[in-house]
């Protein structure tokens, strides 16, 4: 009896030691990940410090610290249209991300519950939509917006962002809704709740993490989008941040390269989404992983 009782203990401790062990392949992988993280952080820090220097000192020693700090570089960037472009990007990106989630949530819920036999084929259509490159849609979208007079307008760009966001948003939320237990909906139905009331008052609050994840991912994607904005926006007043940055870099080639101003512009484009993603990274990761395997 003593021997038989001791055996499981030995096995359990051996299992713990095996789980705690890190193989050479995994150690190399972890090391490479940390190396990539360190390189990314150093590049971001270098970009921030360089944005506070003048062009001459940057050429003399690219890796030196700012001395003195030139906050005027950010004034130069704002005078080149970054302030107006930041407002345009925030309005279009935020509203498009919000509307895409609002439209995708009911569709994803219906597909996740397979309310009719068309749910499977419709889900496949949304999945296929993920593989359509934006370059293929560019010319048809341009002609359609030209017909309705919405080229070079922020509402037109808003509609484009909502449209191209739907396949991924529906796909992401479908997997998330499938991870939610169906027993809650059955209990609500027994209590007399309609399908609409069940969706709005029970399912949506439970899916809050998934909805926030979808919103943040679409917001970041819209904020950084350049292709459709470059093709559709023609007047400076409607430019978004990536377009103003590209124009600012082009202007410096003729005025004399203001490298400090260019790096300040890069910081203005990168910083908002970087801070937002860093703040909500845990919620985003948990929201994306909850629906895996369902």
Q: Would you name each region that the model predicts?
A:
Residues 2-294:
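A hydrophobic, multi-pass inner-membrane permease signature
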